[in-house]
From Swiss-Prot:
<feature type="region of interest" description="Disordered">
    <location>
        <begin position="392"/>
        <end position="415"/>
    </location>
</feature>
<protein>
    <recommendedName>
        <fullName>Multidrug resistance protein MdtA</fullName>
    </recommendedName>
</protein>
<keyword id="KW-0732">Signal</keyword>
<keyword id="KW-0997">Cell inner membrane</keyword>
<keyword id="KW-0472">Membrane</keyword>
<comment type="function">
    <text>The MdtABC tripartite complex confers resistance against novobiocin and deoxycholate.</text>
</comment>
<keyword id="KW-0813">Transport</keyword>
<feature type="compositionally biased region" description="Basic and acidic residues">
    <location>
        <begin position="399"/>
        <end position="415"/>
    </location>
</feature>
<dbReference type="InterPro" id="IPR006143">
    <property type="entry name" value="RND_pump_MFP"/>
</dbReference>
<dbReference type="GO" id="GO:1990281">
    <property type="term" value="C:efflux pump complex"/>
</dbReference>
<dbReference type="GO" id="GO:0015562">
    <property type="term" value="F:efflux transmembrane transporter activity"/>
</dbReference>
<dbReference type="InterPro" id="IPR032317">
    <property type="entry name" value="CusB_D23"/>
</dbReference>
<feature type="signal peptide">
    <location>
        <begin position="1"/>
        <end position="21"/>
    </location>
</feature>
<comment type="subunit">
    <text>Part of a tripartite efflux system composed of MdtA, MdtB and MdtC.</text>
</comment>
<dbReference type="Pfam" id="PF16576">
    <property type="entry name" value="HlyD_D23"/>
</dbReference>
<feature type="compositionally biased region" description="Polar residues">
    <location>
        <begin position="34"/>
        <end position="47"/>
    </location>
</feature>
<comment type="similarity">
    <text>Belongs to the membrane fusion protein (MFP) (TC 8.A.1) family.</text>
</comment>
Amino acid sequence: MKGSYKSRWVIVIVVVIAAIAAFWFWQGRNESQSAAPGATKQAQQSPAGGRRGMRSGPLAPVQAATAVEQAVPRYLTGLGTITAANTVTVRSRVDGQLMALHFQEGQQVKAGDLLAEIDPSQFKVALAQAQGQLAKDKATLANARRDLARYQQLAKTNLVSRQELDAQQALVSETEGTFKADEASVASAQLQLDWSRITAPVDGRVGLKQVDVGNQISSGDTTGIVVITQTHPIDLLFTLPESDITTVVQAQKAGKPLVVEAWDRTNSKKLSEGTLLSLDNQIDATTGTIKVKARFNNQDDALFPNQFVNARMLVDTEQNAVVIPTAALQMGNEGHFVWVLNSENKVSKHLVTPGIQDSQKVVIRAGISAGDRVVTDGIDRLTEGAKVEVVEAQSATTPEEKATSREYAKKGARS
């Protein structure tokens, strides 16, 4: 009984497995048959589909810009440092105790503003002594002159000798000399008293104080009381290659002030604009450069002493120049070239002669004309005569020129 029961279960399991296998076989055959007509139809419709894809792949995408005609400024550039127009260390010209400071650190001051005071007591005493001596000698001189006048009258009647008259004349002259010396002493004492009040010698910004109130200071102190830097105006000192000297001199002879721009350390933001002040009188033989100084009004305090800046000096403007983006200009074995697009969006290599150039645009002196479209991006995929797809047209400069560039791209796409 038990053996018959086990045999029955084995038969059931085998039947179930066979049924499942038959179902999967039938299902796979139906899917294969339903897919075959579609594949046959597709093969009939496109007998050479694979070969066609290999024969004509997608067009290479590029970006293009239109060469434009415009006035282009010519700049000379150099690295420079901002320097104060004047730097003055304010020192005391008399010895004494510092009684007061009349400025705030970092404050802008005018020439003549009171900065500090030295104890004036000793100078007032010296002035009073000099004035007293002057008054005494003034009275002595007046008396000597009166005696001389009497001697002169008596000499006419021979009541005094000639020797006595000459002696009185000499006494008057001596007293006059003493009186003049007393006047000088009074002036000197007054000057010493005036110097006890220390004033700003120039307009500018005061720095940090170098001495505190209460200290004894002297005219021989080298550190001084405070340093004033004149920043209105302020100067920019930079260098140019000696090869640019002729260009600068010729521009100066034209009679117009040369504009100099100060740009920040990253050369991305213009800080201020000034004019050329002077060229140095000799070239640095070590570096082959010449120092140039420009002056800026700096009323907005955009420039600060010892600040590092990039200098740009406008020396000329090239009129009616053909300009393209710098990205379009390439260099090969034959020289500089650009890829030019025709009306069918086919490219051809044109050798060109570049001129003034910066990071954004370049002047082309020969090789293309205004209105020509040049490839600015996707250049590595180009071959002579290849047809391309212009995916974006960029202007060389202004929004108006950008619109013109788009119009050229549309015309090429329609052709």
